[in-house]
């Protein structure tokens, strides 16, 4: 993840079939709507609630919006699973992968920000250590309450999260 005024990051550019076709800076990829890779992780507790994070106002996309438990781009040459493990550690302080499971794959499209997305799920009860540079807040929320919140106030959420959540809930 890149905050405003940080170094340039390069990601793999991929085709519609998720095959690597090049390498480009993050900003160029986003400006030109090139297909690239990302991961999202939904973390659930034993009560069945999901953890949501509120993005820092310093983020360059969707600042201050509620999103997945964690998410991020897949680095060049990195596997999706490894990116999910890395993002869990960086954003919310979970440094393990024992029950991290692939739940869904979404092909790159406008609704995903032109990202091929692998959505993972895992369970966790206990403390989370939020990275204050990336995350401004976090909550555990009941799934039905989240559905209602999204229905009543979709503006509170990153649009890509809303898309993925609705696909996940089908």
Feature-to-residue mapping (PLM):
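Nudix hydrolase/Nudix homology domain
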Residues: 27, 64, 104-107, 111-170
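A structural signal for short, well-ordered beta-strand segments
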Residues: 41, 70, 102, 118-120
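Acidic, metal-coordinating catalytic segment for phosphate/diphosphate chemistry
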Residues: 3-40, 46
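The catalytic Nudix box helix
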Residues: 51-52, 69-102
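A glycine-rich, hydrophobic loop/mini-helix early in the fold
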Residues: 38-70
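A short, polar/proline- and glycine-enriched secondary-structure boundary/capping micro-motif
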Residues: 32-34, 61-66, 141-142
């Amino acid at each position: 993840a890149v905050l405003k005024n940080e170094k340039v990051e390069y990601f793999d550019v991929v085709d519609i079939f998720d095959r690597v076709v090049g390498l480009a800076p993050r900003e160029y990829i986003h400006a030109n709507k090139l297909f690239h890779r990302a991961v999202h992780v939904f973390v659930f507790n034993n009560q069945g609630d999901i953890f949501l994070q509120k993005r820092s106002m310093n983020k360059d996309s969707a600042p201050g919006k509620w999103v997945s438990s964690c998410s991020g781009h897949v680095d060049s040459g990195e596997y999706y699973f490894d990116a999910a493990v890395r993002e869990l550690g960086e954003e919310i302080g979970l440094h393990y992968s024992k029950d991290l499971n692939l739940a869904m794959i979404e092909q790159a499209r406008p609704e995903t920000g032109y990202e091929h997305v692998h959505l993972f799920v895992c369970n966790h009860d206990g403390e989370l250590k939020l990275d204050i540079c990336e995350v401004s807040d976090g909550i555990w929320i009941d799934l039905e309450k989240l559905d209602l919140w999204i229905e009543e106030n979709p503006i509170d959420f990153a649009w890509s999260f809303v898309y993925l959540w609705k696909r996940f809930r089908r």
